[in-house]
């Protein structure tokens, strides 16, 4: 009974952690790309989620097995790095970058296009780079729900039960990310149908990312 309660709590914490603002901003960016089908954008979102969830699982297990977690100073710097990234991507969309078809690039596509080019072609999202972004977000900016999970598993006597709790948290997190991705894809596509050359959701996401990035820097 205690194990079932622990797993249920972990899943709920994972669902709650999945709707943290930095996750929403990242998934809105990935799903807001002007190219790619719904299926392709959903796959990329799941790769981002996979990177994030993998880090959470490793960190949780490291607490159980080695009694080790990310140092406070490292977590603070990673949080600020996330903030800088969000601000930089928001500024890029504001300068009105366009692709060859006249549609606006998403913030993430714009930043990757500016930082790197492959074979002369604009650099866009791939499984590898969205997975990497997920890993970075998993390390930085630990939230109360994530810290509560780590505190809970640290107090579990049986290591295998603690690992099950971390796995349950990751499952809840994955479900939350999947739902956000589906909703985000739907909103972006709806906005493109209404105003193809000026999708409102892109600019709303841009403002959201900028404000969120500033808040991370001020923490």
What is the predicted function of each stretch?
Residues 20-23, 52, 87, 142, ...:
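Divalent metal-coordination and catalytic microenvironments
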Residues 14-22, 137-143, 177-179:
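Short helix-coil transition sites and intra-membrane helix breaks within transmembrane domains
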Residues 13, 44-48, 52, 133, ...:
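Alpha-helical transmembrane segments of multi-pass membrane proteins, especially transporters
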Residues 95-138, 193-196:
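Alpha-helical multi-pass membrane helix bundles of inner-membrane/thylakoid proteins
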Residues 5, 39-116:
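Membrane helix-loop-helix hairpins that form the core translocation module of multi-pass transporters
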Residues 56, 131-133, 137-148, 205-209:
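Core segments of transmembrane alpha-helices
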Residues 32, 60-85, 95-100, 152-163, ...:
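Transmembrane-helix boundary and interhelical-loop signature of multi-pass inner-membrane proteins
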Residues 2-71, 147-163, 187-188:
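Juxtamembrane transmembrane-helix termini in multi-pass membrane transport proteins
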């Amino acid at each position: 009974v205690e194990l079932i309660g622990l797993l249920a709590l972990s899943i709920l914490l994972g669902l709650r952690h999945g709707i943290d603002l930095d996750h929403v901003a990242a998934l809105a960016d990935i799903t807001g790309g002007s190219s790619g089908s719904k299926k392709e954008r959903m796959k990329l979102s799941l790769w981002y989620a996979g990177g994030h969830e993998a880090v959470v699982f490793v960190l949780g297990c490291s607490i159980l097995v080695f009694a080790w977690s990310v140092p406070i100073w490292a977590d603070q710097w990673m949080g600020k790095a996330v903030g800088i990234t969000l601000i930089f991507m928001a500024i890029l969309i504001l300068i009105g970058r366009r692709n060859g078809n006249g549609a606006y690039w998403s913030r993430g596509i714009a930043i990757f296009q500016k930082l790197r080019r492959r074979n002369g072609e604009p650099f866009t999202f791939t499984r590898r780079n969205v997975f990497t972004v997920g890993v970075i977000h998993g390390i930085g900016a630990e939230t109360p729900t994530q810290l509560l999970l780590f505190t809970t598993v640290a107090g579990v006597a049986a290591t295998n039960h603690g690992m099950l709790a971390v796995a349950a948290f990751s499952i809840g997190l994955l479900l939350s990310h999947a739902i956000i991705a589906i909703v985000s894809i739907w909103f972006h596509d709806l906005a493109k149908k209404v105003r193809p050359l000026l999708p409102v959701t892109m600019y709303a996401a841009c403002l959201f990312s900028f404000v969120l990035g500033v808040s991370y820097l001020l923490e």
